[in-house]
Design a protein with these regions (language model features):
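Short, acidic/polar
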Residues: 63-83, 165-178, 258-274, 333-349
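Aromatic-lined carbohydrate-binding/catalytic grooves of carbohydrate-active enzymes
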Residues: 87-126
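Active-site-adjacent "subsite" loops/lids of carbohydrate-active enzymes
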Residues: 41-73, 122-125, 131-137, 145-182, ...
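Catalytic domains of carbohydrate-active enzymes, especially glycoside hydrolases
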Residues: 73-100, 181-186, 274-279, 348-356
């Protein structure tokens, strides 16, 4: 009887060992089959204090129709001036209308940098030097981050690439891949997704083309649900494309409902991994909005985005420096005082957010913005760590 018990125990132990061995081997094989994904973590140890440099700024900055030596000098002046205003990050416009502010082999040269550039031939045939390369070098030389700013779908003010078209998505990914060959710190999308006034291009040809609104096929706006579905496909692909290479951010308009209706799926982006590394809502109002001047619109919209951000995606707030001193546009705060921007920055800091971005560079030197800029500069050298932003790529 005792021998039988011993034999039974022995066989049980052998069986368990065999199962463990098989499971271990299976697990090892499974690990071989599915290699681990590298996770890149980018940390900001201080707040982002940024400015958008738009294609509309280029001429005043001395970047249009100039020789390489002059461009390089003026790009460096731009970066130094940004630093004087407490800026540590520049969002530089590299794609405004399906074009390129760099020596692209696919896209035409941006005419806001070279006014006589070919409308059909790629930028390599128009630029004798590479504007983006020089801007990146100037920024990094002075310790400023440089993010490449793209309007993904916009072809003209009235016409956009169709987000529904796979060709449109592939075309934008080509632009992103080209830009990632430069030492940019980020890829940044503006809020233009479904905003075309006249229609959307459905481009089925891979050959180079020139825009002709009169003959373009149009694919008019689908339902809001489909809009978000089409745009989400692009956002996921860009996130994957930038993995381990650059930070991917999107700057939506400041009205959550309008965003959701125009293809900006904030609910999904701010609740899930794999979409955006950082969100930058454009909250372009004061807390003295409306006929009465008593509506706290900035604070209200800021709260909406914070509540929407279930995943705690790093958030930087776009601020409307360009509206400083404005009268009669339904937002009395801009004409009432010159401390709106500095007050908004303080609010951003109180909420522990990632920082702010000013629209746009030329307004730093515009007469009616002087008071706002002066008050902003008083608090721009805020050194304390506000939030440690960790960007994990999966």
């Amino acid at each position: 009887m005792i021998k039988r018990k011993i034999l039974s125990i022995f066989l049980s132990v052998c069986l368990v060992c065999t199962i463990l061995a098989v499971n271990g081997e299976a697990e090892a094989i499974e690990q071989k089959k599915a290699p681990q994904k590298t996770v890149k973590v980018v940390k900001f140890n201080t707040e982002m204090k940024a400015v958008w440099v738009s294609f509309l700024d280029f001429q005043n900055l001395g970047l249009t129709n100039v020789r390489e030596k002059t461009f390089k000098k003026n790009a460096e002046i731009m970066v130094k001036d940004a630093k004087k205003n407490g800026i540590n990050t520049i969002f530089f416009h590299v794609r405004a209308f399906d074009d390129a502010a760099y020596k692209s082999k696919v896209f035409r040269a941006m005419r806001y940098l070279k006014t006589n550039a070919s409308y059909v031939k790629p930028a390599t045939s128009s630029f004798s030097y590479d504007p983006l390369k020089l801007v990146v070098e100037a920024a990094h030389k002075h310790g400023v981050q440089l993010h490449a700013w793209l309007n993904p779908y916009r072809v003209g003010y009235d016409y956009f690439l169709s987000p529904k078209s796979e060709y449109s998505t592939n075309r934008i990914i080509k632009a992103v891949n080209e830009i990632l060959t430069y030492k940019v710190d980020g890829i940044h999308f503006d809020d233009y997704f479904y905003h075309a006034k006249k229609g959307y291009y459905r481009l089925n040809s891979k050959k180079q083309y020139s825009v002709n609104p009169a003959t373009a096929k149009k694919d008019y706006s689908p339902s809001s649900i489909n809009k978000r579905r089409y745009v989400n496909k692009l956002i996921r692909r860009v996130n994957k494309t930038t993995q381990g290479k650059a930070l991917f951010s999107v700057s939506p308009a400041g009205n959550v409902d309008n965003c959701m209706n125009s293809g900006v799926d904030l609910t999904t982006w701010l609740s899930n991994d794999g979409y955006v590394d950082m969100i930058m809502p454009q909250i372009y109002w004061t807390d003295n909005w409306g006929a009465s001047g008593r509506v706290k619109m900035f604070s209200s919209r800021l709260g909406q985005f914070m509540r929407k951000n279930k995943k705690k995606i790093p958030m930087v707030i776009g601020l409307a420096l360009y509206r400083s001193g404005e009268h009669g546009l339904g937002d009395k705060g801009w004409s009432m005082r010159g401390s709106n921007i500095s007050g908004q920055i303080k609010s951003i800091r109180r909420h522990g957010l990632g920082g702010y971005c000013l629209f746009r560079f030329n307004n730093l030197y515009q007469g009616r913005c002087k008071k706002e800029v002066r008050n902003m500069r008083k608090i721009s050298k805020y050194k304390k760590l506000i939030t440690k932003i960790s960007f994990k790529r999966r």
